[in-house]
Amino acid sequence: MVLQHYNTPENLRGRAMPVQGMEMLSTVARELHISEEELLKQGLHGFLTHQLRAIKAEIFEISGRYGISSVAEMEARYRDGTLEEADSWRDLQRLDHLEYRRDRLVQLLEAVA
């Protein structure tokens, strides 16, 4: 299954920011004596960093629960019989999603840097 992400930077490129947003950006940049571009860059970096921290915390929680470090390791434990799938499959799915989001946030942070 392919998930489509409509609000990716690629899909939003070329769209105009609402006037209120532009005015707010301009006002804050002026108050901080930085360019609007730098303010946007720092704001995006801070937001993405915050999101990444939350994702990593949830990954840490699930990983600690099963004594694993990744989805691959959890799947290996299923295969060797040291982890019951019936009790943990939802966490496996959640961890898989979180790892994808973590990797995507890292890519976005690199693009913003």
Go through each PLM region and give its residues.
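Small, basic N-terminal interaction modules of short regulatory proteins
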Residues: 1-77, 100-113
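Short, glycine/alanine-rich amphipathic alpha-helical segment
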Residues: 79-94
